[in-house]
Amino acid sequence: MNLQQQLAYCQQHQQRLQLRHFDNETAWQLGEKIKRQAEKQGVALAIDITVNHQTLFSYAMAGTCAENQDWLRRKRNVVELLSTSSYAAGLMLQQRETSLDARYGVSLRDYAALGGAFPLQIKQAGIIGSVNVSGAPHLDDHNLLLQVLADFIGLPIGSIELLTPLTPLSA
C-alpha cells in the first residue's frame, strides 16, 4: 500500500468511525474494549481517552512505562492540533516532505505524528476528543484503534481496511 492509498484510507476511516454519542460511561466501555483487544494481541499498552481536555479513561497495562504516557500526550496533541489521526498526520507530512516543527512551529518534545491517536468524532457534531494508545509499533497502535472502534460502533468485521507498511510508488 502506498502513501496515497493510505491517506485515502485514513480519510475513509475518519468518516466512518464516528459515534452517535459519547459520555463518561462510553469512555469506560471503549477503554476496557481496547484493553481486552491488546491482551488478545499480546501487547502491553498505555491507553488514554480524552474529551475536551479532560481525561475520562487512563490505564497503563503491565509492561508499559512512563515513556508510553509521554507518547500518548504527544500523539494526542497532534489530533488536537490537526483534527486527524496522528498516523494520518504523519502521512500528510511525508507527502509534503516536511515535519511538524517545520510546518507548524511546534516542538517535537510535545508532538508526535505517529500512529496511536484517533479523533473521537460525534456524527453531526464534530470532534470532541481523542482515543490514544502507546506500546506497540505505531502502525500496530493505529490498526488496533481502527479494529476496536469499528467493532465498538457495530461495523462488520473486515469492513475497515487495516493499513500495512508503506511501499514505494512504482516507476
Curated annotation (Swiss-Prot):
Database matches in Pfam families: HbpS-like
Top-level taxon of origin: Bacteria
The family this protein is said to belong to: Belongs to the UPF0303 family.
Protein name: UPF0303 protein YPK_1581
Source species of the chain: Yersinia pseudotuberculosis serotype O:3 (strain YPIII)
